């Protein structure tokens, strides 16, 4: 049989290794020969040795695939033309792009948390001129955003960022998202009208529980003990920092169990909604052959189905806000006039339109950032980023903000709760060190 180039390569490397072994008593355990700018996806060549023998082997290691592991956000690793692997050492390993990926998620989470703080603060400021028209502001954020999202989607399509394949993805998941969001809104509004603010804050922490549960069921994701404990501490920290000393327990006794269960059901629907969006992104990667679905495709189609469902529920929702359905058109007209601060009949709208417009812009930026964080990491990470914004916003309300008048005081357990929250975040992000043997890079599980 004719000698192939592979045979010559093995023979040459064996001879070279023999000379290296004679020079050093403790040879390196592994050497990676990486072909940069590989052609036709040829796998890199890895040279391995065993601790117990002097035999060296050459084997081809296929490029690492994207896979769902136990870490949120670690499963989707960007492919790059140049891959740098660990060389030598006792089983040390590195995944190309992992550090960059982690930094991207950290920056996105911090941005989402900051926008979440701004969203909460500006919402309270926007309600100062619109204190008589909160239902108008809620419907503006539902109906008005559809036009904005589809306008952005149109321009992105014309620019070639959004493709026809992206627009042709199945619409049933978006319908499910719209139904979940509208039902969550209706259930939440009905329960919130009978619960106190601190009670709602306590019950809202079940949102994270539902997300973890749905991620395990529908995404097959596994969480480490430190991640579960970290999420628990984050939720407990928010409860301590915001609701401590506010009579939340007494409020639960006064309102009964029915409204509390309805609020928990509302957060169940919201948890299912965010996990469903994560499913949409993961499924679209398969349908688009690795391409990433544009954010505004999800925002636009999800919003239009939500608007349809909200329109069907308007008689019920307006009644919850104490507005007879036959008076809804005049209420919307007056709310719009107050939003723009026009008309002599409308009074008490000082601060409009600046404050409401600032809230609308901040709210859109927050929603987009939240969806992007779901896309690049997971629904649970996005929930943690949103949860962190709660105590920070509470602290901001103690500052001398314009239009708010006398600043509020910090809750009694704010500092202790914030410390618990930070410890929970650090515990969730902590990755336990694992002892590995001779492997250069771990093989991804079969998909």
From Swiss-Prot:
InterPro entries attached to this UniProt entry: CRT-like (IPR013936)
SUPFAM superfamilies recorded: Multidrug resistance efflux transporter EmrE
GO-annotated cellular components: chloroplast membrane
Annotated knockout phenotype: No visible phenotype, but resistance to L-buthionine-SR-sulfoximine (BSO), an inhibitor of GSH1. Clt1, clt3 and clt3 triple mutants are more sensitive to Cd(2+), have a decreased level of cytosolic GSH, an altered systemic acquired resistance response and are more sensitive to Phytophthora infection. Clt1, clt3 and clt3 triple mutants have decreased lateral root densities.
Cellular localisation: Plastid, Chloroplast membrane
Transmembrane region(s): 103-123, 135-155, 172-192, 200-220, 228-248, 256-276, 304-324, 351-371, 387-407, 413-433
Membrane topology according to the record: Multi-pass membrane protein
Transit peptide (first-last residue): 1-48
Record's keyword terms, sorted: Chloroplast, Membrane, Plastid, Transit peptide, Transmembrane, Transmembrane helix, Transport
Pfam families: CRT-like
Similarity remark: Belongs to the CRT-like transporter family.
Physiological role: Involved in thiol transport from the plastid to the cytosol. Transports probably both glutathione (GSH) and its precursor, gamma-glutamylcysteine (gamma-EC). Exhibits some functional redundancy with CLT3 in maintaining the root GSH pool.
Protein's name in the database: Protein CLT1, chloroplastic
Organism: Arabidopsis thaliana (Mouse-ear cress)
Origin organism lineage: Eukaryota, Viridiplantae, Streptophyta, Embryophyta, Tracheophyta
């Amino acid at each position: 049989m004719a000698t192939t180039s592979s045979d010559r390569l093995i023979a040459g490397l064996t001879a070279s290794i023999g000379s290296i072994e004679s020079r050093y008593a403790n040879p390196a355990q592994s050497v990676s020969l990486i072909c940069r700018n590989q052609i036709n996806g040829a796998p890199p060549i890895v040279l391995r040795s065993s601790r117990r023998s002097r035999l060296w082997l050459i084997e081809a290691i296929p490029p690492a695939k994207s896979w769902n592991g136990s870490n949120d956000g670690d499963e989707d690793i960007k492919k790059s033309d140049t891959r740098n692997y660990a060389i030598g050492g006792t089983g040390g390993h590195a995944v190309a792009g992992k550090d960059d990926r982690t930094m991207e998620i950290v920056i996105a989470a911090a941005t989402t948390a900051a926008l979440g703080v701004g969203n909460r603060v500006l919402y309270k400021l926007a309600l100062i001129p619109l204190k008589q028209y909160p239902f108008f502001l809620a419907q503006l954020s539902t109906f008005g955003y559809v036009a904005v999202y589809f306008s952005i989607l149109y321009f992105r399509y014309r620019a070639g960022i959004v493709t026809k394949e992206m627009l042709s993805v199945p619409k049933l998941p978006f319908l499910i998202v719209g139904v979940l969001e509208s039902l969550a809104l209706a259930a939440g509004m009905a329960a919130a009208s009978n619960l106190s603010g601190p009670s709602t804050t306590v019950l809202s922490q079940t949102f994270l529980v539902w997300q973890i549960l749905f991620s395990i069921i529908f995404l097959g994701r596994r969480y480490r003990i430190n991640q579960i404990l970290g999420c628990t501490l984050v939720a407990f920290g928010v409860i301590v920092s915001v609701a401590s000393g506010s009579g939340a327990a007494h409020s639960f006794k006064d309102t009964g169990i029915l409204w509390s269960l309805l609020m928990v059901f509302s957060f169940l629907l919201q948890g299912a909604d965010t996990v469903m969006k994560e499913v949409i992104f993961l499924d679209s990667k398969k349908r688009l052959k690795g391409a990433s679905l544009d954010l505004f495709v999800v925002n636009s189609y999800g919003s239009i189905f939500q608007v349809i469902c909200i329109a069907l529920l308007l008689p019920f929702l307006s009644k919850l806000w104490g507005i007879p359905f036959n008076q809804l058109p005049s209420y919307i007209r007056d709310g719009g006039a107050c939003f723009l601060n026009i008309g002599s009949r409308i009074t008490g709208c000082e601060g409009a339109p600046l404050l409401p417009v600032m809230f609308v812009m901040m709210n859109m930026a927050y929603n987009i950032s939240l969806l992007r964080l779901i896309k690049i990491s997971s629904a649970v990470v996005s929930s943690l980023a949103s949860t962190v914004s709660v105590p920070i916003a509470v602290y901001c309300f103690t500052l001398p903000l314009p239009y708010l008048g006398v600043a509020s005081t910090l809750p009694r357990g704010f500092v202790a709760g914030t410390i618990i929250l930070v410890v929970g975040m650090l515990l969730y992000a902590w990755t336990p060190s694992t002892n590995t043997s001779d492997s250069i890079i771990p093989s991804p599980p079969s998909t």
